[in-house]
Amino acid sequence: MISLKPLYDEIICLACFLTLFCGCDVYQPTKCRSYVGGYVQMNAIDIWQEKGMPSYLIVHLKEEPPVKTYHMCSTGKDAEIYTRLCTKHEDMTYNKVRSIGPAIEDSTPFFVDCDFTSIEVFADKDFNEEHPAGSNLGDIVRFMSWSPIKYIKSGYSELHIYNPEELSSAFYPIMREYFMENYFQRGALSTCYPIDKLICDTDSDDLVLLGHDAPGFLGALYFEMSPDDEKEFVITVTFNTDDGKSLSATTMMKF
């Protein structure tokens, strides 16, 4: 039996070439083998507290130039890395047509190039009696994010149906600050499923393809308890990756 894969790959590369070099306004209907159109190399995280928001931190990809990407139009070694990541996520049979523009990252979902095994959160001072300085706060900090991995592993057939009763009371007020309101309408369909768990209840299956089709936002860390006495802490957050890295960031947090 003759394999059509080389021909298929050539067609994809030709479509990408036309998209990238035929003009800034050109959008080409392109059959995408995978749901995830590209990955961004991740080497560091950034965390911060939004002004006037005392109870949570944002976790974000820290983009340190040059930003390295692997995507559906990559060639050579980068194309091999992209295919390996798609294979890892069982994302090889999407085969739907998208309109791909000059900036590929704006036309198709992108995610970071690693998944995570665990999250750790520490404070530099006693948080309360049960959480002295340096202890893990995973049992009082909730991780909130999105991921399309359930949609992908369903064979691209099972969309998430938004139901606010299935989520914590903190999910909507926080996440609506970063995502369009229509994501939060009752019954709204989405390829991305919400993640809404105490850190101590998460495992590696919950920490795959984090974000909502874009590689920057990784999630929010909501503190379900306020500290007993101190109101200002140095908080350190560590994301442990499935390729053996520990990515840490520190910020001052005021409650």
Predicted feature residues:
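C-terminal motif of bacterial Sec signal peptides marking the signal peptidase cleavage site
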Residues: 20-23
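Non-catalytic macromolecular-recognition regions in eukaryotic signaling proteins
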Residues: 25-255
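Intrinsically disordered, compositionally biased low-complexity segments in eukaryotic proteins
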Residues: 16-17
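Bacterial N-terminal signal peptides that target proteins for export
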Residues: 2-12
